[in-house]
């Protein structure tokens, strides 16, 4: 992807998603001032076509899944979302309408969860498509939840149903008879980041993980 096309794509699709500190996505980096009295929490996850999503998955769903798997990491730490950096590697020749749907999915969940894009990179690849996101959140000092806090004898509590996403993938691959637009498929495509629960568990749970 040449620089003129990259800049045009960013201006047309991603600039409307930009938040404070993103500098209109026109500079080399973003500027971020953490909220007073808060620690920053950072996590990163990537989605690769054929590994984490199927080639015919709706682009908006792929974008929302990308955001949500990262938000889930914040939830596990008891953090609140602040913003994110994202690298998109679209396959060469990806239709503009596909990218527009992808961005619309991001916009929908940005509004739902209260965060904005701060920067990133956009490239073209011969395939497979790959999308990487670094999420930034905040938590009061000393209140982050850790995996290492667990102790022998602790009770283990689970929110949601374990395995729904894996079953949903089998449905979409035709390996399990069920509605391809039903509950299991939706759980595979759209995980639910439990941000409110994670924040409520600060000072209550000794450990957490997503």
Give short role names for the model-derived ranges.
Residues 1-209:
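Helix-biased detector of long, well-ordered alpha-helical tracts
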């Amino acid at each position: 992807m040449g620089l003129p096309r990259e800049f045009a794509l960013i201006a047309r699709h991603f600039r409307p998603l930009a938040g404070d500190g993103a500098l209109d996505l026109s500079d080399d980096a973003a500027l971020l001032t953490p909220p007073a009295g808060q620690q920053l929490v950072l996590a990163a996850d990537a989605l690769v076509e054929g590994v984490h999503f199927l080639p015919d998955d709706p682009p908006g769903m792929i974008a929302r899944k990308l955001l949500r798997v990262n938000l889930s990491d914040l939830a596990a730490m008891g953090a609140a979302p602040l913003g994110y950096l994202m690298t998109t590697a679209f396959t060469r020749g990806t239709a503009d309408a596909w990218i527009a749907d992808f961005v619309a999915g991001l916009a929908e969940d940005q509004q739902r969860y209260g965060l904005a894009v701060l920067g990133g990179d956009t490239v073209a690849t011969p395939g497979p498509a790959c999308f990487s996101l670094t999420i930034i959140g905040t938590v009061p000092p000393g209140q982050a939840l850790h995996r290492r806090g667990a102790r022998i004898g602790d009770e283990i509590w689970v929110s949601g149903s374990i395995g729904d996403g894996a079953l949903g993938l089998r449905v979409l691959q035709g390996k399990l008879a069920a509605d391809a637009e039903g509950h299991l498929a939706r759980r595979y495509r759209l995980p639910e980041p439990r941000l409110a629960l994670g924040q409520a568990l600060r000072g209550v749970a000794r450990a957490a993980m997503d």
